[in-house]
């Protein structure tokens, strides 16, 4: 994993200032093994992308993509749809999200990506970034 991240870092053009980082999100970050995650606790501590306070992700989701019902134990989550259409279930309520639509979830609120209707690009922010924070929910327990 660390070798893969090092290789991605070398391919990602970034400029590091004293108190900032400017970069370009490459296709390898979005579509590669990091699956769009730009920063978070999962990057090695010495990486410019290692953060414990926040996770940021840009993802392109293909048509018919789904994700199981889950919640985040300790993290606030914000997601905005930049393009396309996606159906989400949030705490049991169904929502069709289109460009400009967003949701904000408090820790413990359940989310379920029902289906990507049109290929979509999303920006997700979760804070803080905590290992083992995603808890899967068995539908029969819901």
Task: Please provide the spans of the model-predicted regions.
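A short, N-terminal "cap"/entry segment at the start of jelly-roll beta-barrel domains
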Residues: 1-53, 68, 138-142
């Amino acid at each position: 994993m660390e070798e893969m991240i090092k290789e991605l870092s070398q391919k990602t053009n970034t400029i590091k200032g004293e108190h900032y980082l400017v970069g370009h999100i490459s296709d390898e970050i979005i579509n590669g093994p990091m699956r769009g995650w730009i920063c978070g606790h999962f990057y090695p501590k010495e990486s410019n992308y290692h953060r414990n306070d926040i996770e940021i992700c840009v993802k392109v989701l293909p048509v018919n993509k789904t994700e199981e019902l889950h919640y985040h134990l300790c993290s606030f989550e914000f997601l905005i749809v930049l393009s396309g259409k996606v159906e989400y279930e949030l705490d049991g309520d169904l929502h069709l999200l289109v460009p400009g639509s967003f949701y904000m979830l408090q820790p413990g609120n359940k989310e379920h990506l029902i289906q990507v209707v049109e290929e979509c690009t999303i920006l997700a922010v979760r804070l803080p970034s905590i290992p083992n924070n995603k808890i899967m929910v068995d539908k029969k327990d819901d």
